[in-house]
């Protein structure tokens, strides 16, 4: 999945979704160039250029990934 957050408000909303209790035991990362960032860390997300596309790497069950994809649909972009 590829996401683009564009602004601080979108980054906050995205971080709130991936940090929710249903994903608390699942590692979710964002890859931006050579950097890999914990997607649950707002500070980490804000440390990269929000104008760039980031690859979301989900380390969990497929059904959880499908649920997350629906929740973050507005941040997803075509690859």
Regions found by a protein language model. Name each.
Residues 29-34:
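Short, glycine-/small-residue-enriched flexible loop/hinge segments at domain edges that mediate gating
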Residues 10-24, 35-50, 65-71:
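Amphipathic alpha-helical interaction surfaces in cytosolic regulatory modules
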Residues 1-6:
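Short amphipathic
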């Amino acid at each position: 999945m590829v996401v683009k957050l564009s602004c601080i408000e979108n980054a906050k909303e995205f971080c709130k979704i991936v940090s929710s209790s249903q994903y608390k035991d699942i590692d979710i990362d964002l890859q931006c160039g050579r950097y890999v960032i914990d997607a649950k860390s707002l500070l980490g997300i804000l440390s990269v250029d929000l104008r760039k596309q980031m690859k979301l790497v989900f380390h969990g069950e497929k059904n959880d990934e499908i649920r997350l994809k629906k929740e973050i649909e507005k941040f997803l972009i075509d690859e």
